[in-house]
């Protein structure tokens, strides 16, 4: 009787472990781009980044003092993250066959320079950057924003179809 109980508990544990392991394997991270260049120390919540590393949806990128990185997104947009910055890739939807999609990033602190890629060239309203004071739309152009102590400064660099934010 005791042996049956032990075997039942072991079978239950094995079944639970296999189910949990299978669930973990099915959770696939969504790739949004790669690190093209890096200077100094740039990290995510779980790793220190180097050139060629993949960037995934919902990752927070932290650039320390005197550091920065350039992220090349799958739609050919470029995000350059400056020193002492914190940027999150919130939304990335991209169909490479049609260039349809949507990109949303958040700048919590520091600087982000954006050069629009295929998604926002097709639909200028489809790339936005959230900052503490509101939302910036790229409108198919190039811009840089800096968030410091809750205040946001934004520079329109251009060129863009409408050259507006």
Where are the regions a protein language model picked out?
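Intrinsically disordered, low-complexity segments enriched in glycine/proline and serine/threonine
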Residues: 7-8, 62
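Flexible, surface-exposed loop/linker segments and immediately adjacent secondary-structure boundaries
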Residues: 22-64, 68-69, 73-165
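Bacterial N-terminal signal peptides
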Residues: 9-17
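Bacterial N-terminal signal peptides that target proteins for export
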Residues: 1-7
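Intrinsically disordered and other compositionally biased segments
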Residues: 8-9, 22
């Amino acid at each position: 009787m005791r042996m049956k109980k032990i075997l039942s508990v072991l079978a239950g544990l094995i079944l639970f472990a296999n189910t949990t392991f299978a669930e973990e394997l099915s959770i696939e991270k969504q790739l949004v781009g790669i690190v093209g260049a890096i200077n100094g120390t740039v990290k995510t919540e779980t790793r220190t980044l180097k050139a060629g590393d993949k960037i995934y949806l919902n990752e927070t990128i932290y650039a320390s003092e005197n550091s920065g990185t350039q992220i090349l997104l799958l739609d050919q947009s470029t995000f350059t993250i400056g020193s002492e910055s914190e940027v999150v890739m919130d939304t990335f939807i991209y169909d490479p066959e049609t260039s349809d999609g949507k990109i949303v990033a958040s700048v919590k602190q520091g600087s982000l320079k954006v050069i629009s890629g295929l998604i926002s060239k097709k639909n200028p309203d489809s790339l936005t950057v959230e900052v503490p004071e509101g939302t910036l739309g790229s409108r198919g152009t190039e811009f840089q924003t800096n968030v410091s102590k809750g205040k946001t400064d934004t520079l329109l660099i251009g060129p863009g179809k409408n050259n507006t934010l």
